[in-house]
Amino acid sequence: MTGPAIELRRMVLDDLDLVRRWLAEPEVARWFLAGSTIEDELSDLERAVNGQEPTEVLLASWGRRPVGWCQWYRCSDYPDHAVGLGARPEDVGIDYAIGEPLDRGRGVGTALVATLVAHIRRLHPGVGVVADPEASNAASRRVLERNAFVLLDERVVVSEPDGKVMAIYRRPPEAR
């Protein structure tokens, strides 16, 4: 990816219409709506934006143009999911999506995850970061591997709604 850096800002309720459009994109829906619906995802995001969930949701922009969103959470706030992942209590989990079709396959996802990890580490130095894309999501796996995440396992995660095999990655605290 060349050009400006990824910028992150807290998502606001007005951003949900844009996220709705992105969730309707087949390539986003394929991975982000597994076992869920657009309305379910938007409801979860709205609760997080309103502070009713312990997840920070961020809008990602590239050159001041929104390109996707991401979120992070302390694994200890979601203990069932943390146990399912095999995450450590002090770990932080992440999710991310590139919503704009023209921005996929150009390094934007790699830059987004790098920016998100840097954001998390500014707030919580020394934490491990975990992610669990579907095992068949080769693009997401490449993004994580390019960001020094290490594959821990591939298996069904009970707390995931659709019963698919997930690739569980962790970026250790010392990875820069």
Where are these regions (language model features)?
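A short, well-structured alpha-helix characteristic of acyl/acetyltransferase catalytic modules
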Residues: 1-5, 10-46, 176
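Hydrophobic alpha-helical core bundles mediating ligand binding, dimerization, or RNAP-core interactions
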Residues: 19-23, 94, 113, 120
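Acetyl-CoA-dependent GNAT
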Residues: 44-93, 97-103, 173
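Conserved catalytic-core motifs of GNAT/GCN5-like acyltransferases
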Residues: 71, 76-77, 132, 150-165
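C-terminal "cap" of GNAT-fold acetyltransferases
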Residues: 88-90, 154-176
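Conserved acetyl-CoA-binding loop-helix of GNAT-fold acetyltransferases
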Residues: 105-120, 142-146
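Conserved GNAT acetyl-CoA-binding A-motif
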Residues: 122-132
